[in-house]
A protein has these predicted regions:
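A cross-family glycoside hydrolase active-site/sugar-binding cleft signature
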Residues: 14-16, 61-63, 141
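His/Asp/Glu-enriched, well-ordered alpha-helical/loop segment
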Residues: 29-33, 40-127, 147
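Short peripheral tails and domain-boundary helices/loops at the edges of structured domains
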Residues: 141-155
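Small/polar (Gly/Ser/Thr/Ala-rich) solvent-exposed segments
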Residues: 130
Length: 168
C-alpha cells in the first residue's frame, strides 16, 4: 500500500485534455501551453497504464474547480479511463466505486452494495456495462439511503459540446 500514490493522476488527465486536444482558439492555450498540456496528458495516461500493468491501484477523480470540469459529469472520467487506458467498462465502474472507496479508506462503509454498508448507488436508463455514457442519464441517486428521483442537474451545454467529441 502506497499512501502517497493514492488516486494516481486521472484528475490531471482531465485538466490537461483541453490544453492538449482543444483548438487553441477555444482553450486560449498558447502553442507552448498546448505542447505542455500534451506532455502532461500523455504522461498521465502512460503512468496510469503502467500502474495498472504492474498491479498498482489507480483511482478516479476530478476537480470541479477547473475549467471544463462540472459538478455533474464525473461519468466522463470513467469514459476517459476506458478510452485512454484501455480498461473494460466493468473495471472502470469498479475503480470509480469500490476501488476508490478502498483507496480513500472507506471501503468498509461504501463503494459496493452489501449488508451493513451505506446505501449509495445510482440507477441509469441504460446499462453502463454496455456504454459508460449511460451514466449521463440518471433515473435515481441514493446517498446514505436518501433517494433523489430523476435528478436534473443544470448542464453547461457549451462545456458538454466541447468535451463530447473526446468520448469516442
Amino acid at each position: 500500500d502506497q499512501p502517497r500514490s493514492r488516486g494516481l493522476g486521472d484528475v490531471y488527465k482531465r485538466q490537461a485534455l483541453p490544453y492538449a486536444l482543444f483548438d487553441p482558439a477555444i482553450s486560449g492555450a498558447s502553442e507552448k501551453d498546448q505542447y505542455n498540456g500534451r506532455i502532461v496528458f500523455d504522461g498521465v495516461v502512460e503512468s496510469a497504464r503502467t500502474a495498472l500493468a504492474n498491479g498498482i491501484p489507480v483511482g478516479l477523480g476530478n476537480d470541479v474547480g477547473c475549467p471544463y470540469v462540472t459538478q455533474y459529469d464525473f461519468w466522463r472520467e470513467l469514459c476517459y479511463f476506458h478510452k485512454y487506458c484501455g480498461v473494460s467498462n466493468q473495471f472502470a465502474l469498479h475503480t470509480a466505486t469500490l476501488r476508490n472507496a478502498r483507496l480513500a479508506g472507506v471501503g468498509d462503509v461504501t463503494g459496493s452494495i452489501e449488508a451493513g454498508k451505506s446505501a449509495d448507488f445510482i440507477v441509469t436508463r441504460k446499462n453502463p456495462l454496455d456504454d459508460l455514457a449511460a451514466l449521463r442519464q440518471l433515473e435515481l441517486v441514493v446517498c446514505r439511503g436518501r433517494a433523489v428521483h430523476k435528478p436534473a442537474p443544470k448542464r453547461n451545454k457549451t462545456v458538454d459540446a466541447l468535451l463530447d467529441p473526446y468520448l469516442v
